[in-house]
Amino acid sequence: MADNYEARTSSHYDNNATEFDDYFNEFDTGIGLGPDDEDDFLDIYNLSPRQRVVYQFRRTVNQFLSQYYALEPWQRILLAIGGGLIGILALLMLIFHNKILHKLVEMSNDLKEKWSTPIVLVTLIFFVAFPPMIGFSLLSTTTGLIYGISFKGWVILAIGAVTGSICSFALFKTILHSRAEKLIQMNRRFAAFASILQENNSYWILALLRLCPFPYSLTNGAVGAVYGVSIKNFAIGNIITTPKLLIYLFIGSRIKNMGETESSASKIFDLVSILLTVLALGLTAWVLYFKTQKRYQQLQDQSTINTSNDLDIDQNFEI
């Protein structure tokens, strides 16, 4: 009996080891990482800390490469060029950061004196609200660099962001509705939030969507595919979240202060303030996102139960 038990135990561990190796082989080849299968293989509680780090790293790299090679050739070229430019700018910033900061301060002071600057900023912020445009965070931080934490800066951001979002949503809800549906299908996170919006499309839920870590312009277009979301609720949801724009103004003002001061301690304080602000914003956004995912899972489970109940067979039925 002991021999049989040991044989069964050995066979059990061999099977587990084989399944574990097979999973990582599939992981390397990109198999088994679809939206429906991704969460089925996260039982990594029995892995060591080092194995978990390696697992998460390999998973992240694989997902990035899968998404990258799924793009059109011209999109991959643009992404590579953009990544190269960001790397060059980061290197230049590291080497010539003092000169660059002083130049930014001079330019911001000049732009602040021009009457046309608010109009230009509102226009640019308005247009980056349309997918696939990018640059909302950059323009918002630039506004903070020019006007600091001020009512004028907040009004510029609020007008551009709210009007741009509403117009983008209206366009994709009506004329470009098919394109909006494709935007939702591009990301399962969008699909999850779309399911929640179909259950509850109040402006509070839409405000929560704006606080989650989703691309700004893509969110405006994707929500247009959700049935039942009104322009009124979408507008109110965006207005509610306009205080969030003060964060961009704060970051811009700290960057400007770093260029104006000569004190190393003051620069370090400003840099730490920026990092802590970004970290707090990121943590808040991800907490909200994971709570949203939990609610989405509850809706999925409830839908499964309802479907199962609908398919119950009458035991008295005879053929």
UniProtKB/Swiss-Prot annotation:
Residues 1-76, 140-143, 254-267 are lumenal. Its main location: Golgi. The gene is TVP38. This is Golgi apparatus membrane protein TVP38. The keyword Manganese does not apply. Golgi membrane protein involved in vesicular trafficking and spindle migration. Belongs to the TVP38/TMEM64 family. Keywords: Glycoprotein, Golgi apparatus, Membrane, Transmembrane, Transmembrane helix.
